[in-house]
Amino acid sequence: MLDCRAVIMLWLLPWVTQGLAVPRSSSPDWAQCQQLSRNLCMLAWNAHAPAGHMNLLREEEDEETKNNVPRIQCEDGCDPQGLKDNSQFCLQRIRQGLAFYKHLLDSDIFKGEPALLPDSPMEQLHTSLLGLSQLLQPEDHPRETQQMPSLSSSQQWQRPLLRSKILRSLQAFLAIAARVFAHGAATLTEPLVPTA
């Protein structure tokens, strides 16, 4: 009869032969998240081409607007020690942010634009946002429901300004998320090391 260690080693054999890290039930594939978030950053920058004077326009945000926009903050546990202790708080905040921006990209603000044609930077951004969101969704949890911003119908003249503001905010959010995933990929992915 096989002892317990032999059974565990047989169970881990497929990952050892492929040189993969042993999957954890609560942790994402940090390397894949790093790659997707890096790709998302590039897509967000490509989707928001500078438009001269529009970049100089700074709209003052009221308190309600500031509170609705997801931001990764210190208390979210996205710092190196917070990720090491329990990455779920940080990953939940990133999932919420991705869902928020996906909701905005699905709104009438971005509808009917030539930039949303298949294979356009905006469509690729939308698809990649969805891909990273799905990768971060815990397998044992159904899709989380969260409060989405209530969007009133925008006027045609408002859309370029709103698009620019949303994409700038998304760029900032994705830059921080990419740093989180880069740290996670470098330090939290533990390769399988056989014990003697």
UniProtKB/Swiss-Prot annotation:
Q: Does the keyword Signal apply?
A: yes
Q: Where in the cell is it found?
A: Secreted
Task: Give GO MF terms, alphabetically.
Answer: cytokine activity; interleukin-23 receptor binding
Q: What does a knockout show?
A: Mice have no overt phenotype but display compromised humoral and delayed-type hypersensitivity responses. They also have impaired secretion of IL17 and IL17F, higher susceptibility to Klebsiella pneumoniae and Citrobacter rodentium infection, do not develop experimentally-induced autoimmune encephalitis a mouse model of multiple sclerosis, collagen-induced arthritis a rodent model of rheumatoid arthritis and also spontaneous colitis induced by IL10 deficiency a rodent model of inflammatory bowel disease.
Q: According to its UniProt record, in which tissues is this protein expressed?
A: Secreted by activated dendritic cells (at protein level). Detected in various tissues with higher expression in polarized Th1 cells and activated macrophages.
Residues annotated as signal peptide: 1-21
Q: What induces it?
A: Up-regulated in trigeminal glanglia after herpes simplex virus type 1 infection, in the lung of mice infected with mycobacteria or Klebsiella pneumoniae. Up-regulated in microglia by combined LPS and IFNG stimulation. Up-regulated by FASLG.
Q: Name one GO cellular component term.
A: extracellular region
Picking any one GO biological process from the record gives:
positive regulation of osteoclast differentiation
UniProt keyword annotations, A-Z: Antiviral defense, Cytokine, Disulfide bond, Immunity, Inflammatory response, Innate immunity, Secreted, Signal, Tissue remodeling
Q: Does Signal count among this protein's keywords?
A: yes
Its subunit composition reads: Heterodimer with IL12B; disulfide-linked. The heterodimer is known as interleukin IL-23. Interacts with IL23R; this interaction enables recruitment of IL12RB1.
Write out the function statement from the record.
Associates with IL12B to form the IL-23 interleukin, a heterodimeric cytokine which functions in innate and adaptive immunity. IL-23 may constitute with IL-17 an acute response to infection in peripheral tissues. IL-23 binds to a heterodimeric receptor complex composed of IL12RB1 and IL23R, activates the Jak-Stat signaling cascade, stimulates memory rather than naive T-cells and promotes production of pro-inflammatory cytokines. IL-23 induces autoimmune inflammation and thus may be responsible for autoimmune inflammatory diseases and may be important for tumorigenesis.
UniProt record similarity statement: Belongs to the IL-6 superfamily.
Which PANTHER family does the protein's record reference?
Answer: INTERLEUKIN-23 SUBUNIT ALPHA (PTHR15947:SF0), SGRF (PTHR15947)
Full protein name: Interleukin-23 subunit alpha
Q: Which organism is it from?
A: Mus musculus
- Gene designation per UniProt: Il23a
